[in-house]
């Protein structure tokens, strides 16, 4: 048994851990969990925990449903609150999902990302990610379609001390840091009730695990503070939606491969081709980075979200932004992709972003001129004249772009690609057939 497994088993005994929760993520990004007693963990390390894969979204067909969850000891952390008896703690580990013969399950989101990271490694790169995660705090209420009510009336950077949960961010950050997740900073975002917590850089797989842990902890802390948290991309028509702006960089050993001292923006050829790859394939990957019908209510003109495939230095109206806070700090050279929302599957999102960027690097894509104007204010004719391709305006548009994409099919693997398309087509058709209050209000008198 290796040292990490021995450390986990020893910690369970020393901390008197009562339950071990084994986590994994389905294809749509929902967190799944099975709890085992500490005495069962050594066996789980050796043989895994079997479960019915046909009962998990996108995993397996009923006639080939035996699936195994194998805990990854490197992800072991003690949860930051006690069990219901008030005397014990629980711990959690993420799992890799395999078939009974030990081969990776093609439906495992972690495996999808691992394959892209292995490709980056073959090219000599390690991928690091830093997300800005936005979400809303709402007052308690039914989940029946009733319009939600924000927990406060604050705005951008406001010190909202009179809200319904004045200590929420402090409580959330304390919980995150107890789980080994480093927070860079936090603040109130632009809309009432909207919060942002930025996680410090980590390798892409660890960060995807961190994002799943983040969403779980934030919801639990919110409930404890008497409010509820929502990662819905656009819960309020009149306010900006919730993004997960994703900062990415590639390193070669300890060297930032995105940095070049000879460029005016200090961007290397690798960085420029990486950006060009994301711009070229932006429409194809949109259904993954923005996977819900509601996601496209956020990606609208004037919504503080990208609507065209453009890039720029410090330009927040562009799809890809090059942050210029510290222009002479080599280690911080990075690109920020502004389209993903905080309700995406982070494993699949990081995988397709990396696949698009690496395609640009491998093929030597040439980056066009940067956007120096406010892209939101340009007409469609002006955008076309400048070479800015419109991003999908609906989930239906995004699926049309995705279904013929060799890049996305290769990045996700045939199983996840086919299931994702089937599931999302069903979601889109269900939405298209739904008659909304807007239609009744405006058209019933016809």
Swiss-Prot record:
Major localisation: cytoplasm
Cell location: Cytoplasm
Cross-link Isoglutamyl lysine isopeptide (Lys-Gln) (interchain with Q-Cter in protein Pup), sequence positions: 363
Reaction equation(s) it catalyzes: L-glutamate + NH4(+) + ATP = L-glutamine + ADP + phosphate + H(+)
Residues that coordinate or bind L-glutamate: 241, 298, 304, 316, 338
Protein name (database record): Glutamine synthetase
Keywords annotated in UniProt: ATP-binding, Cytoplasm, Isopeptide bond, Ligase, Magnesium, Metal-binding, Nucleotide-binding, Ubl conjugation
Positions annotated to bind Mg(2+) 2: 134, 189, 196
Swiss-Prot/TrEMBL site (Important for inhibition by glutamine) positions: 61
Record PANTHER family: GAMMA-GLUTAMYLPOLYAMINE SYNTHETASE GLNA2, GAMMA-GLUTAMYLPUTRESCINE SYNTHETASE
Positions of Mg(2+) 1 binding: 132, 245, 336
Pfam families referenced in this protein's UniProt entry, alphabetically: Gln-synt_C (PF00120), Gln-synt_N (PF03951)
Residues holding ATP: 184, 247-249, 316, 321
Organism of origin: Mycolicibacterium smegmatis (strain ATCC 700084 / mc(2)155) (Mycobacterium smegmatis)
Family: Belongs to the glutamine synthetase family.
Taxonomic placement: Bacteria, Bacillati, Actinomycetota, Actinomycetes, Mycobacteriales
Database matches in InterPro entries: Gln_synt_N (IPR008147), Gln_synt_N_sf (IPR036651), Gln_synth/guanido_kin_cat_dom (IPR014746), Gln_synth_cat_dom (IPR008146), Gln_synth_gly_rich_site (IPR027303), Gln_synth_I (IPR004809)
Its job: Glutamine synthetase (GS) is an unusual multitasking protein that functions as an enzyme, a transcription coregulator, and a chaperone in ammonium assimilation and in the regulation of genes involved in nitrogen metabolism. It catalyzes the ATP-dependent biosynthesis of glutamine from glutamate and ammonia. Feedback-inhibited GlnA also interacts with and regulates the activity of the transcriptional regulator TnrA. During nitrogen limitation, TnrA is in its DNA-binding active state and turns on the transcription of genes required for nitrogen assimilation.
